[in-house]
Amino acid sequence: DAVSITSSSDAAELFGDLPLSSDRPDFWNRTFSEASGFIGKSPEEQLPVRKKLISILIGRDGRMEPLAQKYFSLESLIRIQQREIGTGFIGGKAVGMLLARNILSQEDHEFYAKRFVPHDSFYLGADVYYTYIVQNGLWNLRLLQKTKEGYYKYARELHEKILTGRFPHEIREQFRYVLEYFGQSPIIVRSSSL
């Protein structure tokens, strides 16, 4: 008999390691593919690779970088990228959530193991926003709105045009994948950009 899985924690346990399609032969995927070759090597050999991945995925924030270096393994950085829609930084909320989980897991594993279910997150890369703005012909309007004089003057027009834009086909396909992945399970979307 087939059993329907409706619990998000059960779904995370079964499918949490499934990556998004990564058949794009670009700098981003080549970088992470090459980084995969360092899995199993010594921490000293992994260090420059981890630093590079942290700088392009997590960010170069002065306060966050040392914590990321301490608590993100090479494997965990590659797993983040495998579940990222688009490319680029994953954003502060996602970084904070992942960092907090890693700190708890590494500093008090017994506490963590008893109280936390596996997380089952996907991440939206920063390039998705910029691609959306450019593909919908909004770049110049965004630049005008970012000025002191244009902040309020162009805000409504930019807002309305953003609401009527479309994502590129590849991004829409990745969104579909995520929705199909979760099926009927409830999802939470966290973003200050929405």
Task: Locate each region found by the language model.
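N-terminal beta-alpha lobe that positions the nucleotide/phosphoryl donor
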Residues: 1-194
